[in-house]
From Swiss-Prot:
CDD domains: RNase_PH_bact. Belongs to the RNase PH family. GO terms for biological process: rRNA catabolic process; rRNA processing; tRNA processing. This is Ribonuclease PH. The lineage of its organism: Bacteria, Pseudomonadati, Pseudomonadota, Alphaproteobacteria, Hyphomicrobiales.
Length: 238
């Protein structure tokens, strides 16, 4: 039995609250159960120096956790003068995931930065950041389309979402919360498109190695969860 009493293939309650920032071109507060992430998408009408005069745009991401997003207060990374390795890894993952469904040439020489700030953490913050970050990115593109800067259908090739899976107490399960993640024998994150294309898989055996059969079961669970997340994204942005 999972600590949350969910079925192995049951996700937490998922919600998207759009338009939570009056300043950002796109914004979304995404909730995966008790994990809450604020995602804002900001437009800059310029690109990094290495993309100037290329005709291509850029989508990037930044990620951070508020000091009291966890059970005990975390020191702000700004106070230590540098970002931690985990932070850098996650924000690069979010950026790669969002770029996988963007036509950078159709975007033109503009940059969109998606900021993902964890307000409350209970496992799966990176997957929530990707899934909610897409909604914020979509709304930013819609804002641009309303001003005749882009056409959303040309820039946006597909949806993208992410979910965690793992083996808990010998059973493959979907969408781990912190209690499950901290005790899981295997922990994995899957990023996939709405059409089922695989963008990235991160998997680690925390205890004994997992088998190929167990991996395929985790992939099956992830695909089911991501297709549901994409349905919820489409409902949110419609």
């Amino acid at each position: 039995m999972r600590p949350s009493r969910r079925q192995p293939d049951e996700m937490r309650a998922i919600s998207f609250e759009r338009g939570v920032s009056k300043h950002a071109e796109g914004s979304c507060l995404v909730r995966f159960g008790d994990t809450h992430v604020l995602c804002t998408a900001s437009l800059e009408e310029k690109v990094p120096a290495w993309l100037r005069n290329s005709g291509k745009g850029w989508v990037t991401a930044e990620y951070g956790m508020l000091p009291r997003s966890t059970g005990e207060r975390m020191r702000r990374e700004a106070a230590s003068g540098k970002q931690g390795g985990r932070t850098l890894e996650i924000q690069r993952l979010v950026g790669r995931s969002l770029r996988s469904v963007i036509d950078l040439e159709a975007l033109g020489e503009m940059q969109i930065t998606v900021d993902c700030d964890v307000l409350q953490a209970d496992g799966g913050t990176r997957t929530a950041a990707i899934t909610g970050g897409f909604v914020a990115l979509h709304d930013c593109l819609s804002w641009m389309q309303a001003r005749q800067m882009v056409t959303v259908e040309r820039v946006l090739k597909d949806h993208v979402a992410a979910i965690s899976c793992g083996i808990y107490d010998g059973t493959p399960v979907l969408d781990l919360d912190y209690a499950e993640d901290s005790a899981a024998e295997t922990d994995a994150n899957f990023v996939m498109t709405g059409k089922g294309g695989i963008v990235e898989i991160q998997g680690t055996a925390e205890g004994a190695p997992f088998t190929e059969e167990e991996f395929h079961e985790l992939l099956r669970l992830a695909r089911k969860g991501i297709f549901r997340l994409v349905e919820l994204q489409k409902m949110a942005v419609s």
